[in-house]
Amino acid sequence: LMDGQDVVAMSDVQRVAMRREKIGFTFQANNLVPYLSAVENVELMLRLNKRLDKAGKVRARELLARLGLAERMHNLPGQMSGGQQQRVAIARALIHNPSLVLADEPTASLDTERAYQVVETFAGLIHEQNRAGIMVTHDLRMCEFVDRVLQMQDGKLVRIYTGRDEIMELVRGGRH
């Protein structure tokens, strides 16, 4: 169920619309459109949902500025670092106020400092907007920013960490 709707019972058209309107995505490869500027990449989600208006354009710029990209919003992806590109992808995932944000290895190509900045910002924005977020990562250090950890091994759920102390012990390398 998503927002009270049975996703399995939906038609393909309904599922596509639901994904486009209610789910934000960011992946290991940021999948930015190379010939669109940072702000145009973010606005793309609103354009696809036919919701790009003046307020949406302002929100795109505010979100990029909040992510430290005010000076880069008119740059093409190839003119930005990996961390900057990933922050553009985060802005794009959040611009349409989705109910759920999925992040698949969002820090895989980043150095530790940049990875922390990206995940901390991402988690902060998700909490601030009162959204649900799911992050897939092999980097246990990134679990510092989450509320719950589901540990998988060989495709099976082996443990759920829910308490802050339990999660921080996992982050510090106590168990994994």
Each predicted region: which residue ranges?
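ABC family nucleotide-binding domain
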Residues: 1-145, 149-152
